[in-house]
Amino acid sequence: MERGKRSGDFETFKEFMKLTQYFNCIHIAGGYPVEPVDIHASIRHLDCLYEKLTLTDKVVHAYSLGAERVEDVMEMVRIAGGLSEAEFQAKPRMYTNINSVSPLQHDYPMLDGAMRMAKRGQPVVITPFTLAGAMAPVTMSGAVALSLAEGLAGLALLQYIAPGCPVALGTFTSNVDMKSGAPAFGTPEYMRATQMTGQLVRFYGVPLRSSGTCAANVPDGQAMWETSNSLWAAVQSRTNMVYHAAGWLEGGLIASPEKFIMDCEVLQMIQRYFEEPIWATTEDDIAIDAIREVGPG
């Protein structure tokens, strides 16, 4: 926290993994919170996954970038769990996320990794990235329709090659600043797009992924209201998996440990809000004796 803004490195990556393990409101160790540029790209996935498996007990993620990375990660997860190949494939042990190349395209290396995951029974989240006014129509209806078309195309492909494989649809639809072209997050448009997608994904009967995004540059008031807006849109849409739930800044260009902790406070409050409703009506629950003891006034 005292080292200022800098490029991502392996030490910072490990620090974020320790934060991930510490907070119970974080359930998954997703992608790289920072890109450890001091580790060569050819072996980065091996070192990063090793730290995830040794520093956390959270569900891990593989970047779907072709055969080598995905196969390496699946094998490391299988070995870490002491599993046979049949046991590994019997139920979800990890997951990946792929993004479409809007409009109306999927990148082959991502599809290749996703298909390899699906064939071994591991979940794939398909998340089109559609920005209204950029690579998607400027209307919310058009942007959401485009996102759903791209997501369903990927879902259909995976079900074709591995019928019944676990798949989720993601939403990452927002608007752009029409002056600068920069993505905007935590806006009313982002929230509405998330909720529109949630309604349709429930209709299709598959799980939903959304995100705790913001576009602010520092962990300030703007950062927190944008992230809170995004998180409330997620839970109101009955999201099953929230990406980027803690630590996100500047549209994902910055990972902030300070904001990670601030976001976890918000996540814990939301979790508390969604706990089972209170039906307790006994005298002890209502604290009748305490009320009588204090009396009026």
Q: Which residues are covered by each model-predicted region?
A:
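Helix-rich catalytic cores of soluble enzyme domains
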Residues: 2-240
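Histidine/acidic-residue-rich catalytic or RNA/ligand-binding cores of hydrolases
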Residues: 221-222, 253-257
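Acidic/polar loop patches that form or flank catalytic/metal-binding clefts of enzymes
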Residues: 206-212, 241-246, 276-285
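Catalytic-core signal marking the mid-to-C-terminal active-site face
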Residues: 258-297
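Charged, low-complexity surface segments at secondary-structure and domain boundaries
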Residues: 2, 61, 254-256, 292-293
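Glycine-rich phosphate-binding active-site loops on the catalytic face of alpha/beta enzymes
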Residues: 233-254
